[in-house]
């Protein structure tokens, strides 16, 4: 099975920077905006969860911490799976995990249930971030930087879009009903898109060519460059921990309301694009 998937003679090839490359980018961007909801929904529903389970902010914030644990593991583990099996199967699998996690959260009765489910949500969301960026980079040469940046921005678009939508849902529904709505939206959009995503390969690309181009970056080895990027990512997330995770709950506590908190979060992440 693996050999058949990786055999270039049985997989449709796509010319780099072609119309099909851009169509693939649009599909990956769309599924990224929808699929990374797992990173942002918990931020908006955190005040409601604090009330329902009678917990303080410190304990409630563990929900986002476990999400990031899953997100980190997912980028690595699912990236390895995509290297072996292609993009289509992992995306379908991640969609199933994401939808199932939201549905399972609806019937959760203990806080630790949600902690575990957030790990799965984070892992699923990771599929549409790092692995998607790595995939789309293979289908562009002249516009590779732009293509990767567009896929990377899907997470920020999700952060700008989903909090507003979820806060509007919460005005009329409790958080479990909102989670059910999210599950339906994800299933309705992501499964059809995953059907159109094929395990394509790009023409006119070789690993040696990419490696040669990358060595021009101040003579840094790939491992050194990766370590520096990891450290930069950690530094970025440390700085964003308070505004990204606690801003909605803070606005609720200060009397501004959930809607205002969601708007502040949305503006902040929209600026990140």
Q: Where in this protein do the model-derived segments appear?
A:
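Hydrophobic core of transmembrane alpha-helices in multi-pass small-molecule transporters
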Residues: 33, 101, 112-127, 234
């Amino acid at each position: 099975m693996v050999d058949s998937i990786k055999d270039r003679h049985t997989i449709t090839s796509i010319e780099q920077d072609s119309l099909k490359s851009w169509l693939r980018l649009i599909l990956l961007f769309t599924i990224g905006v929808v699929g990374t909801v797992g990173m942002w929904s918990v931020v908006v529903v955190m005040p409601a969860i604090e009330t329902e389970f009678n917990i303080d902010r410190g304990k409630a914030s563990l929900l986002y911490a476990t999400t990031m644990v899953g997100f980190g593991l997912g980028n690595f583990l699912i990236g390895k799976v995509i290297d072996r099996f292609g993009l289509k199967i992992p995306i379908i699998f991640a969609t199933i995990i994401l939808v199932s996690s939201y549905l399972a959260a609806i019937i959760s009765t203990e806080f630790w249930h949600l902690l575990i489910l957030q790990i799965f949500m984070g892992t699923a969301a990771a599929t549409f971030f790092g692995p998607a960026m790595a995939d789309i980079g293979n289908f562009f040469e002249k516009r590779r930087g732009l293509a990767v940046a567009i896929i990377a921005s899907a997470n920020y678009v999700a952060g700008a879009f989903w909090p507003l939508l979820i806060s509007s849902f919460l005005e009329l529904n409790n958080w479990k009903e909102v989670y059910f709505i999210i599950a339906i939206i994800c299933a309705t959009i992501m499964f059809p898109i995953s059907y159109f995503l094929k395990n394509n390969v790009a023409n006119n690309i070789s690993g040696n060519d990419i490696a040669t181009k990358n060595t021009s970056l101040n003579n840094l080895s790939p491992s050194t460059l990766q370590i520096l990027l990891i450290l930069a990512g950690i530094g970025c997330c440390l700085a964003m921990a308070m505004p990204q995770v606690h801003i909605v709950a803070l606005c609720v506590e200060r009397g501004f309301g959930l809607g205002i908190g969601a708007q502040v979060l949305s503006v902040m992440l929209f600026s990140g694009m």
